[in-house]
UniProtKB/Swiss-Prot annotation:
Binding, ATP: G46, L47, S48, G49, A50, G51, K52, S53
Catalytic reaction(s) noted: adenosine 5'-phosphosulfate + ATP = 3'-phosphoadenylyl sulfate + ADP + H(+)
Pathways involved: Sulfur metabolism; hydrogen sulfide biosynthesis; sulfite from sulfate: step 2/3
Role summary: Catalyzes the synthesis of activated sulfate.
InterPro entries with a match to the protein in the record: APS_kinase (IPR002891), P-loop_NTPase (IPR027417)
Name under which the protein is recorded: Adenylyl-sulfate kinase
Organism annotation: Vibrio cholerae serotype O1 (strain ATCC 39315 / El Tor Inaba N16961)
GO terms, biological process: hydrogen sulfide biosynthetic process; sulfate assimilation
């Protein structure tokens, strides 16, 4: 049987068929029942500066106040740990989304309402994550803010650096952003307040029976 060394130096079987799935004694439905909620993944996508983290954070705060069990995965935060080994090449960006998708799936399996805030510029990558989850459990949330508004905000100074050529392949400037064609939730973040956007999200969750109480 062929062997290969992993990153820690341990020998592993090279063939993936030697890895089997271990079934849990407590399943997803039981975890969700204990939490009295329906698991879901809300995937916030949009340009840098669109307001993804702001709206997702405000929504999580509101859901927590209502007694729901949540977790917010933020694009910057995961690059301090889980994805700290990745850069910003197309390949690394895709791997970044793949890892977050798998993590979000595990958190959903734990019965949580998962919120993620990532630019995730390509439709194929967002579809890749949707395909990981049961039908109706992935909600694409488009934080719909124009490039002009995002660039005017420029909270991290990234657009200025991109325009100056200090950052290459920056989404919206010299790298394309593929806006969702039919998002589950379309947030006009350049026109409404954060509170209004949160209310829109809560209503959408209630309509899908993901939450029962939100007023």
């Amino acid at each position: 049987m062929s062997k290969q060394a992993d990153s820690l130096g341990f020998e592993q079987d090279a063939k993936p068929e030697n890895v089997v799935w271990h079934r849990h004694a407590v399943d997803k439905a039981q975890r969700a029942t204990l939490k009295q909620q329906r698991p879901a993944v809300l995937w916030f996508t949009g340009l840098s500066g669109a307001g993804k983290s702001t709206v997702a954070g405000a929504l999580e705060n509101r859901l927590a106040a209502l007694g729901y069990h949540t977790y917010l995965l933020d694009g910057d935060n995961v690059r301090h740990g889980l994805c700290s080994d990745l850069g910003f090449s197309e390949q690394d960006r895709r791997e970044n989304i793949r890892r977050i998708g798998e993590l979000a799936k595990l958190m959903s399996d734990a019965g949580l309402i998962v919120l993620t805030a990532f630019i995730s510029p390509h439709r194929a990558e967002r579809q890749m994550v949707r395909d990981l989850l049961p039908n109706g459990e992935f909600l694409e949330v488009y934080v719909n803010t124009s490039l002009d508004v995002c660039e005017a905000r420029d909270p991290k100074g990234l657009y200025k650096k991109a325009r100056a050529g200090e950052i290459r392949q920056f989404t919206g400037i010299d790298s394309a952003y593929e806006a969702p064609l039919n998002p589950d939730i379309d947030l006009p973040a350049g026109e409404k307040s954060v509170d209004e956007l949160v209310a829109q999200c809560l209503q959408a969750l209630a309509e899908r029976h993901i939450i029962q109480r939100w007023v």
